[in-house]
């Protein structure tokens, strides 16, 4: 009967530690920036591990700014190459998971209201379910035409213009169809997710103002201790007062920056005021550029890892 108490103490200790992180404004290091964008840095310790991170806070209603995404159209480019190809945006950050073999994005990407990439819709079952398929609904963050952000669990269909969104919870379903439709999920509580810009990843970290890490429900990394591993991380969320929060955490440098667990990442996003938040691809992919300058140091041995998609903040022309 003592275990729940121990876990509760750990949870509150972790929450207290993230709340005590010492963030310093770093706008001047990445100038010039509009008044609606601020950059913060932190070089501290977190739960006994060295910690380095940066985050940006961007006002969504600033009509001088454009929030968009771009893909490599079957190729992969480094964030710096996207910065050059996209004519020097204010911000570039990695986002979706992908295949190293095919360069395919494995999550939804929406640009100008058009889906450029789709989620994985079926995964082969294992063990007793080896003859079945799992149908994951994975997290994404989007911004609509009114510049309102949302995080939802999605099912995508390349024959449909919009993703199917589940706002209350991820759907966990399985069946015999290798190419499922929305009806394979046996859930009618969905809506069309009409976003102008969106990027996918997973798992969701915060839902309706509370930590809810849904990596098991999203069927991410089954069998791995993904939740408890210290890794470089990228996350994106939004606040109730209309600010987009983009977080990049350095890692895989034990004496300099250890990275964080998913629980720690969620606590950080909550402490930054996020009402909802999403984990994005991390590890060697984590990279955040402000005005073309690196914030965290990427952990990939070659430097910035080429990725097939990025999220961008640009000047609105």
Where are these regions (language model features)?
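A short catalytic or substrate-binding loop motif that flags glycine-/basic-rich loops and adjacent residues
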Residues: 46-50, 132-135, 197, 226-230, ...
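Short glycine-rich loop/turn motifs
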Residues: 50-55, 138, 200-202, 231-235, ...
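Active-site-adjacent helix-turn-beta-strand microarchitecture at beta-sheet edges
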Residues: 103-225
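Zymogen propeptides
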Residues: 20-160
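Flexible, D/E/H-enriched segments
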Residues: 21-44, 151, 212-213, 293-317
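Bacterial Sec-dependent N-terminal signal peptides
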Residues: 1-22
């Amino acid at each position: 009967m003592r275990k729940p108490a121990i876990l509760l103490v750990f949870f509150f200790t972790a929450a207290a530690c993230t709340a005590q992180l010492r963030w310093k404004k770093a706008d001047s290091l990445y100038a010039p920036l509009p008044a609606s964008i601020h950059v913060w840095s932190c070089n501290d310790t977190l739960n006994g591990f060295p910690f380095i991170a940066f985050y940006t806070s961007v006002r969504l209603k600033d009509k001088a700014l454009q929030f968009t995404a771009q893909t490599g159209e079957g190729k992969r480019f480094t964030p710096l190459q996207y910065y050059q190809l996209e004519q020097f945006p204010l911000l570039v950050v990695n986002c979706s998971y992908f295949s190293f073999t095919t360069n395919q994005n494995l999550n939804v990407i929406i640009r100008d209201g058009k889906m450029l990439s789709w989620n994985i819709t079926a995964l082969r079952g294992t063990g007793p379910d080896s003859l079945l398929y799992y149908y994951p609904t994975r997290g994404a963050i989007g911004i609509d035409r009114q510049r309102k952000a949302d995080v939802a669990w999605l099912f995508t269909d390349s024959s449909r213009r919009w993703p199917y969104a589940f706002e209350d919870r991820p759907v966990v379903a399985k069946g015999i169809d290798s190419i499922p439709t929305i009806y394979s999920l046996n859930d009618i509580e969905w809506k069309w997710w009409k976003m102008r810009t969106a990027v996918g990843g997973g798992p969701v970290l915060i839902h309706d103002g509370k930590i809810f890490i849904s990596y098991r429900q999203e069927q991410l990394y089954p069998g791995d201790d993904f939740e408890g591993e210290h890794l470089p991380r990228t996350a994106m969320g939004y606040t109730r007062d209309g600010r987009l929060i983009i977080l990049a955490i350095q890692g895989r440098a034990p004496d300099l920056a250890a990275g964080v667990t998913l629980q720690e990442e969620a606590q950080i996003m909550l402490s930054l005021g996020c009402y909802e938040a999403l984990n994005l691809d991390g590890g060697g992919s984590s990279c955040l550029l402000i005005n073309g300058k690196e914030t965290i140091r990427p952990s990939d041995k070659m430097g910035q890892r080429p990725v097939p998609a990025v999220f961008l903040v640009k000047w609105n022309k």
